């Protein structure tokens, strides 16, 4: 997701 490691 946008704020966690690009997941």
Swiss-Prot record:
GO terms for cellular component: extracellular region. Belongs to the allatostatin family. May act as a neurotransmitter or neuromodulator. It comes from the Eukaryota. It comes from Carcinus maenas (Common shore crab). Keywords: Amidation, Neuropeptide, Secreted. This is Carcinustatin-4. The modification Leucine amide is found at residue 7. The lineage of its organism: Eukaryota, Metazoa, Ecdysozoa, Arthropoda, Crustacea. GO terms for biological process: neuropeptide signaling pathway. It is found in: Secreted.
